[in-house]
Amino acid sequence: MKVFKKLASVFAAAAMVLSVTACSQNGGSSSGTEASGNTSGDSSAVTQGSFRTLDQIKESGKIVIGVFSDKNPFGYVDNEGKFQGYDVYFAERIAKDLGVELELTPVEAASRVEFLETAKVDIILANFTVTEERAQKVDFALPYMKVALGVVSPDSAVITDPAQLNGKTLIVVKGTTAETYFTENYPDVKLQKYDEYNQAYTALSDGRGDAFSTDNTEVLAWAMSNPGFTVGVESLGNTDAIAPAVSKGNETLLKWINDEITALADEQFFHADYDATLAAVYGDNVDKDSLVVEGGKM
């Protein structure tokens, strides 16, 4: 089921609270970044309400990056209390190349923009889809991944067409492109909204909804590890760019990230990231070149 071979390269390169923190000098390894128990939601490395420039981050010796803690295999905390995933691997490399310590702060989908607007983090690396609406509030760097939407449902009543959901209940996570897409295109679908991905998957497993929609990369990975569920809609909507985001107007940090993504193409970094964090999950079911973006070129 080479699902991602269906994803066409149609976008130009985008140039545009429980909180757990983690500190690491690790540079892009697959060993994970250890999570520790700060539950304040604030970081001493960030001045609230005012973003930090590249020079200020370097002077502080620490960069704060917002990631998911419950979206396996992209950003999650494992059984040993360490952050893992595709986004985390990239975050570790950013800190290494900047020569600073890494602090990871978990974010929810609906809080990603707010964490940048209030400068709670320096960068968001949390499966952040580039949209025009979001780009009015934050600045997106070049993309490093591409996705569409997918729909997962129980084997006993597989949803193969979104129109089948009219009059039924679809589980979504607040602040995601899935929420926006179904609100705009399928008004007769009843949306059951959750703040966190683990809440949404629990609701699906408990039968509180007929299906769940989010990025197809995510639902496919989840279905592979949860027998009894099928991704009946493998690619829905546009092929979208996933990119890092910084606070609006933080030009020095944005330029550094764009330069970093461009330079990392020489070593095929994101293919290595895929091999370290995603290959074991997807196996032969995914063509990595249909997901991975190198050098910001979709």
Task: Enumerate the language-model features and the residues they cover.
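A ligand-binding cleft/hinge motif common to bilobed small-molecule-binding domains
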Residues: E114, F128-Q136, T183-E184, S205-T239
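Extended ligand-binding regions for polar small-molecule ligands
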Residues: S24-N26, A35-Q48, V88-D97, T176, ...
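C-terminal motif of bacterial Sec signal peptides marking the signal peptidase cleavage site
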Residues: L18-A22
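Ligand-binding clefts/hinges and TM-proximal coupling segments of bilobed small-molecule sensing domains
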Residues: G28-S29, T47-Q48, T180-Y194, V231-S235, ...
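Short helix-initiation/N-cap motifs at beta->coil->alpha
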Residues: E103-E114, A157, K174-T177, Q192-T202, ...
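Periplasmic-binding protein-like
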Residues: M145-S153, L220-I261, V281-M298
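Flexible hinge/capping segments at coil-to-helix
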Residues: S153-L170
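Extracytoplasmic small-molecule ligand-binding "clamshell" domains
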Residues: G32-N38, D42-N127
